Regions:
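Short linear regulatory motifs enriched in tryptophan with gly/pro/ser
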Residues: 1-181
């Protein structure tokens, strides 16, 4: 996750023949502890110098909402600029130019959890394996996006002074219902 401090991350090994939708459904959601088909998501290529709201950007995601409570994916270009292409048949190996190239993944378009996916190397096998990671992922339906999550971490970590965020609210005001605080 690019927008949290400290950074929450996962390192996974996947086969290159997965589609982007499969990458979301069977790799990224489980690796982060999220439910599949609950919030909308979108992928896009990351090139140096591009902005996330650039009108020339192409987003890849489901062409329809997966559940009634998700933001309709056809609205992505209106909120974030660019165009939307359905991800159902796009394979992971077609999205990366080579080792070191990156792909953006946004989960929950309302909270805009931004992830950067970097290709380290190609994997021939069709296996999926969680190799490493750090940090508890954000709970589903958490309020306040990255800022509030970073505040929570700063209040819960023993060395909170190393994080720049402070909250005027108690953790219980907005997170207690998720973590039983």
């Amino acid at each position: 996750m690019q927008t949290t401090r400290p950074r929450v991350w996962r390192r996974v090994r996947v086969g290159s023949r997965l589609t982007l939708r499969q990458l979301h459904d069977v790799v990224l959601c489980p690796a982060m502890g999220w439910k599949r088909a609950y919030h909308s998501y979108a992928f896009r290529e990351l090139r140096p110098g591009e902005r996330h709201d650039d009108e020339s950007v192409v987003w890849f995601g489901p062409g329809e909402s997966q559940l009634e409570q998700t933001v309709d994916m056809t609205q992505v270009p209106f909120f974030y600029g660019g165009a939307l292409v359905k991800d159902k048949d796009l394979r992971v190996d077609s999205m990366f130019e080579g080792e070191g190239s990156r792909l953006a993944y946004v989960y929950d378009l309302g909270q805009y959890w931004w992830h950067s996916i970097t290709l380290e190397s190609y994997c021939k096998e069709d296996s999926i394996e969680l190799l490493d990671g750090w940090g508890q992922a954000v709970p589903e339906d958490s309020d306040g996006g990255s800022w509030n999550y970073s505040v929570l971490l700063s209040e819960l970590l023993p060395d909170a002074s190393r994080l720049p965020f402070r909250s005027p609210l108690s953790i219980n005001d907005w997170w207690g219902k998720y973590w039983g605080l």
